[in-house]
Design a protein with these regions (language model features):
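Short catalytic/ligand-gating loop segments at beta-alpha or beta-beta junctions
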Residues: 113-120
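N-terminal single-pass transmembrane signal-anchor helix
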Residues: 2-34
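Short, exposed beta-strand/loop patches in secreted or surface proteins that constitute
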Residues: 109-113, 144-147
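Short, glycine/small-hydrophobic-rich surface segments
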Residues: 53-98
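Long, low-complexity, serine/threonine/proline-rich intrinsically disordered regulatory regions
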Residues: 98-102, 106-111
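Membrane-proximal N-terminal amphipathic helix
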Residues: 35-63
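Short, surface-exposed interaction loops/tails
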Residues: 120-159
């Protein structure tokens, strides 16, 4: 009777243990990658909004105070455009959807307009859990975005 080459039971157990250890080390890294992707996407969207705001202001400067932005904003309406600074007050349809004219899903974001005229909206609707300790400049569910229509600045406010 010929002996056929095969793996011993010890070798198989060793391979199973090795796969288990590699899986235990790799899984937490993949979880962090998902949160990083969501955070990067949110920061990219915020940069796009800031670019649109800056483009409107740039057109106002080039046209010497005449507002001619490509968005559907009425320059004569003081609720939509700040004639003194050249920044759009809203790039949306209402106080609760201030960016729906420039964001594809702008209506689904829950923004509010404060008494101070600032728009505030939640950061990290994608479900990125709060970091402990909080990392400045990285949006999580404790933070919020703030748009100042006087200065045209959209910024992340860390809580």
């Amino acid at each position: 009777m010929k002996r056929r080459p095969a793996f011993t039971l010890i070798e198989l157990i060793f391979v199973i243990i090795l796969i288990g250890v590699l899986g235990a080390v790799a899984l937490p890294k993949f979880k962090g990658m998902r949160d990083n992707a969501k955070t990067t996407s949110e920061l990219s969207t915020a940069a796009s909004v800031q670019t649109a705001i800056d483009a409107c202001h740039g057109e106002w400067v080039i046209n010497e105070g005449t507002f001619a932005c490509g968005f559907d904003i009425d320059p004569a309406d003081p609720a939509q455009f700040d004639a003194s600074s050249g920044y759009p007050i809203t790039l949306g349809s209402s106080d609760t959807t201030p960016f729906d004219k420039i964001l594809k899903n702008g209506k689904s974001v829950k923004w509010i307009k404060g008494a101070d005229g600032y728009y505030r909206g939640p950061a990290s609707n994608g479900g990125v859990k709060p970091a402990n300790p909080d990392i400045a400049g990285k949006p999580d569910s404790n933070d919020y975005w703030e748009y100042n229509s006087t200065t045209g600045i959209l910024q992340l406010v860390d809580n």
